[in-house]
Curated annotation (Swiss-Prot):
This is Mini-ribonuclease 3. Disulfide bonds: none annotated. Involved in correct processing of both the 5' and 3' ends of 23S rRNA precursor. Processes 30S rRNA precursor transcript even in absence of ribonuclease 3 (Rnc); Rnc processes 30S rRNA into smaller rRNA precursors. One of its GO terms (molecular function) is ribonuclease III activity. The active site is at D17. Belongs to the MrnC RNase family.
């Protein structure tokens, strides 16, 4: 069994990236989005570093997270990947990594209910800020 509480933040983010991507793909298909180009464009609007950073800011501003979750975010944000982000600034990239670490953390702890709450909140925040994805 993997001890998510001791796992490297970048490893948590690695898992979280895959888990979050799966949630988003399911969400888009559930909304009836089936054309490949549309799926890619809409998917990117949820999984980009910029989008994930927006979610982190919202979760922190609204006190949505527990102290433990905020600690996971801090660990993820402070992790040094050694890579330079291509399409965003370092701060946005670090917040994105923090969000993915939080998703990976809950996934590996099998906290399905809380994972669902966080992901569905993220989707709601991004759809509201972008005017929805019903187009």
């Amino acid at each position: 069994m993997i001890d998510a509480k001791q796992l490297n933040s970048l490893a948590l983010a690695y898992m979280g990236d895959a888990v979050y991507e799966q949630y988003i793909r399911y969400h888009l298909l559930q909304k009836g989005k089936v054309r490949p180009n549309q799926l890619h464009r809409l998917g990117t609007s949820f999984v980009s570093a910029k989008a994930q950073a927006k979610v982190v800011y919202h979760l922190l501003e609204t006190a949505f997270l527990t102290e433990e979750e905020e600690a996971v975010l801090r660990r993820g944000r402070n992790a040094n990947s050694g890579t330079v982000p291509k399409n965003t600034d370092v701060q946005t990239y670090r917040h994105s990594t923090a969000f993915e670490a939080l998703i990976g953390y809950h996934h590996l702890l099998n906290n399905r209910e809380r994972l669902d709450e966080i992901v569905y909140k993220a989707i709601a925040v991004l759809e509201e800020q972008e005017g929805g994805t019903s187009s």
